[in-house]
Amino acid sequence: LALILGIALWMGGLLTSGWRSGAEAQGRVDFERDIRPLLLARCSGCHGAERSKGELRLDQRERALRGGASGPVIMPGDSAGSELIRRVTSRESTEQMPPTGERLSERELGLLRNWIDAGANWPAETVSGATANEPRRAEKSTWWSLQPMRAAIPPTPADIPAAWAGSAIDRLVYAGLAAKGLQPSPPADRRTLIRRLFYDLTGLPPTPEEVSAFVADRDPGAWERLVDRLLASPQYGEQWGRHWLDVARFGESKGFEQNHIINNLWGYRDYVIRSFNEDKPYDRFVVEQLAGDVVGAGEPEVEIATGFLVCGPYDSVGNQDEAQQKVIRANTVDDLITATSNAFLGLTVNCARCHHHKFDPIPTEDYYRLRAAFDGVTHAERVVATAEARATHAARLGPLEARRKSVVAEIETLEKAISSRALKLANREGRWSLPRATRQFNEHRFAPVRATHLRFLIRATSDRPRSGENARLDEFEVWTAGEATRNIALAATGATVSGSTTRRAEDVVGGNTYGVELVTDGRFGERWFVGSPAALTLRFPRPEIIDRIVFSQDRTLEPGTEASHLGSFVTEYEIEVSEDGQSWRRVADSQAREPFNEAQKIERFLARVTTADEATRLETLRAGRRELEGEIKSIPPLPLHWAGKFVEPKEPTYVHRGGDPQRRGSEVAPASLAILDGALPGFALSARAPEAERRLALARWIVDERNPLTARVMVNRLWHYHFGTGIVDTPSDFGFLGGRPTHPELLDWLANRLREHGWRLKPLHREILLSQTWQQASDHREEAARVDGSSRLLWRFPPRRLDAEEVRDTMLQVAGRLDLRAGGPGFRLYRYLEDNVATYVPLDHHGPETWRRAVYHQNTRASLIDGLTDFDLPDNASAAPTRARTISPLQSLTQFNHQLTLELASVLVERLEREAGADDEARVKRAFQLAFQRPPTASELAAARRLIEEHGWRALTRALLNANELFFLR
């Protein structure tokens, strides 16, 4: 406890002090971000433009502050005295607001209270998305994002500072500030800038040596050279590729109930990273992800790009019901439509699946025209290899497969002839004294025999005529002979049991649910999963005279009950006994029992009808087959990647009325969206157009230079990741319910520049990073915040918390353990356990195999990723064009006590000893340089030395790895 208090006091007193202004700004309630969306979502239905109950409107500043028929409802500075707060917290049915539906959450109530207590700041004119008093539907003739891009040259404001006059970006941002009476912030200091730049472009901190060199380099071109160096680094593609993977809803498990892992999707991740590093033109990047198999046939590095189409959640459970199968397929294609329209066009086309889009001019027919373009896409793995590799592989494999096919054909012909004779003999001579085996109950009597051991050899199951593996067996009973007969196969009477199992104890959360001990536990319902060898051995505490066994799969089932879902059960077997556990003799077998099916009937009589020549020939052929199969297996297979398979649609595409696949509407063919008909030529294909042509036509239409959405959407994403919020704050929705651009002229200027640069992103990055706008300090200024609380107009650089991956990578780098190996299969921060469903169990130890960058972690859906989920790692059940950046006590508690933190704290101590020697002051200074890229202040140095004296070096390094300054970017 003393250690924890010591570290907490040291961190609270020192490390947060340098961050206070940024942290407070992060926690400030912002009207546009926090309050307007809340009022629109929860209040404007009754108090908006269409309805204003009680003469109260909460969608307009003046009318909201004025109040309604009963007076003001918002008392700035006094939430406790505000009628609005009283109503939303009331439990009286006649007063509570909203009157029906879900109540406001504690978080929403807290936002409202804090906003009112802070003065209920409601900017007179703000840039926002749809409000309740605007038209309820966008018109394609007037909606801003559907209009052609403007190519105007930004004017130079008369009073602009000289440093801001040289860049079009700066001129446009300055004009927006000046219009609100705001001034930009001064430039950040050089240490802040280099740290900001490294995280922006690479997601990693600079080394102390890189910081010192840049701070000392006063050459005017030093900043440009640094920007260019980082844009050329491999880590740039890892950082910006990670952003795109969020947009692409990339996850390496299928989601849904089973959530099985996908082990060969990493090729798409590597393709994305490689594309960013190579500065692949964005239009080419789009086309390859939709039709890489078409435009890059025979080029694996291009073909693999279609992983975009199938990297989303996929319901692989299957269903016997035809109607349900159609629903699952409709949902699967809907994911493709959603991902494509969101990522590349910034449109929510998926909202037109069941009816015309409620807000954007997208008719239902257009949704299904887009569906027709994707109807041939299936979620599956496929070979991705060069034509040369395919030819070489075929040349080696072809002759062997041909020989194997010939051998197999001869074996099948011979076996068929023998089986036919065996079946005739079985039907003629077969006499059975016992009924066929069942799931529910099977008894087998034999002559009384003395035994201390009994062995039950499973020779066949209900679905395997020659193997006992995978059978399920519940209670197994061994009964003594005589009148006072008793079951001695019980753990309670001292019997012990051994046998194979297909599941290990560590493979099952909570223990070995499938263990062999279940056959002697005296309870029904849980079954032993038989493995190999398929045998059960019982040992009794003393010699016994026995004369029968009883076994079943599930004795609770009624006779005749269909229970195929329970798997296979025992049908053929042998019973052996022993008095010493060494010498065994057979006392009974299933030959007396009626065969379970025709295949097992044939199996029993094969030996009697097979001639010596036939047996010899079969053995020779089977040996030849085994040899050929061994040779075939020795040839390395062509690489399989989860990149989708493409098949020609079996039937036309129809509109689903109300989104129901059972309610067919009119037939549609692949075509473009009418929403952009006025801006660029559309495409319309035949309903019988080849599958590949459909996706390629769509891709080329999306990247047509006249398309006003594609370039706008992508440059807005760049702006979003550079500044924390896009010019449009809804990066994947440029429709009516999305945000409006704060700087529309700047958005169009950037989009035009992207096309002028040949759709390459790095030149645009460079222009943004060289701008004075990006290089501003992040210090909070109260007078500016009153006008623009979230700095949407960019009067300062918006500070932010590091993303989850950046947090982990930073800790590893500071400790000196980050492994920068790139590409290939990912690592796991969990143990993967697969039964019918998948389970992901967090690791309790972290070693070199987990020290790679987090972008290479095999992220799965619907699972808590240890150390990352707490910092808002998205689940990717859907796309994550924006990430939450929460700040919570749980993050601090988890981070402070996490096994990785503890391990790296010790590793960092060792690093400091190696790099700074035995001098305590030198080691403290080195620690601060590694963690924060700055030396400690005198007070920090003194406090650190006291902490070390009281609690040791690991206390200091643990504190540094949990400090605000490490996790926040200014």
Tell what function each PLM region has:
Residues 25, 97, 144, 256, ...:
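Active-site histidine-acidic residue metal-binding/catalytic motifs
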Residues 956:
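Globin-like tetrapyrrole-binding proteins
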